[in-house]
A protein has these predicted regions:
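Solvent-exposed loop/turn and edge beta-strand elements of beta-rich ligand-binding domains
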Residues: 1-220
Length: 220
């Protein structure tokens, strides 16, 4: 009779250490976020609160597969930065995610597009040398790469940046800083105050034109 060869399967999950600041490095509280697994932001990666941050919830037990299908769990929450601007996401698989800001702190411009985060690990080829309990060491997880693609709408134009995130292979984490810019929200973000200011400016111009026309008529 034959024998089944020994095989070692090592599964890792990863962590994102998020920090929310303004363009002067002031820590921002209560910026709201949701995480998605698709570009259109229709398949939400549900998370629940824990003492250490927000933990990804597996949809398998909810009638779905990975991050699609199934019912929304009652314990799923929207993420928010704390008083120190921190939000931590735990239990992520490798792959691409879309971090969408759903609400910015008062007085700041909300990000219009989701941040595209890609997590790419490299594992050892010496799988049989792994011993249970070794965790993220050079025997198992050799490298961890993470990138962020950010679109910003500034000065009337889009700017796109690709950034290599700082990672820690020993704990499987990546650090990302999300920036909100100071200033009144532009009309594209739905700021009523800006619309009122623009309306007042239009009225002023119309009144000035009417006054000039009246003066011309008197001279004639």
């Amino acid at each position: 009779t034959g024998t089944t060869p020994w095989d070692t399967v090592v599964c890792f999950t990863y962590k994102i250490n998020g920090l929310k600041v303004n363009d002067h490095n002031k820590l921002l509280k209560n910026a709201k976020f949701r995480l998605y697994s698709d570009e259109n932001c229709t398949n939400e990666v549900y998370v629940k609160e824990s003492p250490n941050g927000y933990v990804v919830m597996n949809r398998d037990s909810l009638g779905g597969t990975d991050h699609t299908g199934g019912a929304r769990p009652s314990s799923a929450v929207e993420m928010a930065s704390d008083a120190k601007g921190v939000f931590t996401i735990l239990g992520l698989d490798q792959g691409t995610y879309y971090l969408k800001e759903t609400d910015s702190p008062a007085g700041y411009r909300e990000l219009l597009d989701p941040i595209v985060i890609t997590i790419k690990p490299t594992f050892t080829d010496e799988r049989n040398n792994y011993n249970a309990g070794e965790g993220a060491t050079d025997k198992t997880l050799k490298t961890l790469e993470a990138t962020a693609h950010v679109k910003e709408f500034l000065d009337g134009a889009y700017k796109e940046n690709d950034t290599d995130l700082k990672t820690d292979v020993t704990v499987g984490s990546a650090n990302i800083t999300v920036v909100n810019y100071v200033g009144t929200k532009l009309p594209i973000t739905g700021s009523n105050l800006t619309m009122i200011c623009l309306g007042a400016g239009t009225i002023t111009v119309v009144c000035a034109l009417a006054l000039n026309e009246k003066r011309k008529n008197k001279k004639d």
